[in-house]
UniProtKB/Swiss-Prot annotation:
This is Phenylethanolamine N-methyltransferase. Sequence repeats lie at residues 4-10, 14-20. It comes from Mus musculus. Residues 1-26 are annotated as: Disordered. Pathway: Catecholamine biosynthesis; (R)-adrenaline biosynthesis; (R)-adrenaline from (R)-noradrenaline: step 1/1. Keywords: Catecholamine biosynthesis, Methyltransferase, Repeat, S-adenosyl-L-methionine, Transferase. The lineage of its organism: Eukaryota, Metazoa, Chordata, Craniata, Vertebrata. Octopamine binds at residues 230, 278. PROSITE patterns: NNMT_PNMT_TEMT, SAM_MT_NNMT_PNMT_TEMT. The gene is Pnmt. GO terms for molecular function: phenylethanolamine N-methyltransferase activity. S-adenosyl-L-methionine binds at residues 46, 51, 90-91, 96, 112, 117, 169-170, 192.
Amino acid sequence: MNGGSDLKHATGSGSDPKHAAEMDPDSDAGQVAVALAYQRFEPRAYLRNNYAPPRGDLSNPDGVGPWKLRCMAQVFATGEVSGRVLIDIGSGPTIYQLLSACAHFEDITMTDFLEVNRQELGLWLREEPGAFDWSVYSQHACLIEDKGESWQEKERQLRARVKRVLPIDVHKPQPLGTPSLVPLPADALVSAFCLEAVSPDLTSFQRALHHITTLLRPGGHLLLIGALEESWYLAGEARLSVVPVSEEEVREALVLGGYEVRELRTYIMPAHLCTGVDDVKGIFFAWAQKMEVQV
């Protein structure tokens, strides 16, 4: 959602979460249950709940959508986060999280566990009829960045720089499988509302963070957006469990994962955006840099 429920993202590596779970004897019961629950995930319902008004109303600068776009734009405006290769971990059916990133990386990989989400991304990337309309988000990103770029140019650049949309399983030590179709290690990772949404407990959350960190070069950057103190969200017929995390638990997981936390911001979800599609309390945004030497 534009809040905690942006939890669009699922966990696994294949197109069939049930099959993926059955094929992995190391999956614990909690992770299997998460994978099975996501079989009922409905991308369009998720998008309506979180990216159409009221949460998708970007006219109020105090809204959650503008806040997330500002967080991303401000980090990229520093010039410190750039390179060639960026991986978006658990993209779900959304693209807004890459609108500011795409000017700084020429090779972008989007990923998701669910085939339905990868298909939804494909509709937008190919400009097919019926694709979700992200133009309001693209316009707002251009407004924030204030570089004189049109929203059409912004979207054209993002489409050109997304080179592949792949399955991922953040619960596997090699989340993208082997051999990887992505040039590794990446210079940066982006992940929005993924890890907490697919982890049955805090230990799984921390382990998933460790797994994706293996994809990132030492000195590389992670930009992480997620839900605070959320335990469930809706995506159509699916009611999906979330591991509730606090700001301090996020910080601790990043430090334990070998990161220097450059910035950690929080957004408290206002009452008018609490619409009954989840129980999210707030959103966090973390900018973290992978230590050159892992402790």
